[in-house]
Amino acid sequence: IATAYAKEGANLVLTGRNVQKLTDAKEELEKKYGIKVLPVQADVSAGSDNEAIVQNVVKQAIDTFGRIDVLINNAQASASGVTIADHTTEQFDLAVYSGLYAAFYYMKACYPYLKETQGSVINFASGAGLFGNYGQCAYAAAKEGIRGLTRVAATEWGRDHINVNIVCPLAWTAQLEQFQKA
């Protein structure tokens, strides 16, 4: 996603938990596409002051670039392959905080800037929620929450000329195979 925007000449704010990955991405994208990249370590997680973490990212973005045109929420961490019966609260929290809460906090913090620029929000959900993939309960729950949040934001923010959309990538599953055969 970052590469696609960089190819179009967009300056970027990249967030993540791993400083080295952020630094590597910054160096590669700036060198290859001649854009400016602001890497910010940020982790929305249980027990953290998540609103302050996100506000810090948004402040750095505004201080560096002066505006926000597009917000893309694509982050998600989860324990994959763990059944509902075996899931721990900590594993469930990991998915919900890194996905659903992160999208909520970033959308809330970016709203005034997106309103100014009549910008866009692109949130990522997943076919895992649509199809109920085995061992994906927390991931699917977070992604389905993001779908709902996105629909509400599209309704509320449309009057402010903010375009809000959801992308639901699908992995090939047995359910899709059965659907194709039907």
Predicted regions and their residues:
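Canonical Rossmann dinucleotide-binding motif of NAD(H)/NADP(H)-dependent dehydrogenases/reductases
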Residues: 1-13
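Conserved glycine-rich Rossmann-like NAD(P)H-binding loop of the short-chain dehydrogenase/reductase
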Residues: 10-24
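Substrate-binding pocket helix/loop in short-chain dehydrogenase/reductase
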Residues: 82-84, 88-93
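Active-site loop immediately N-terminal to the catalytic Tyr-X3-Lys motif
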Residues: 85, 131-137, 159-160
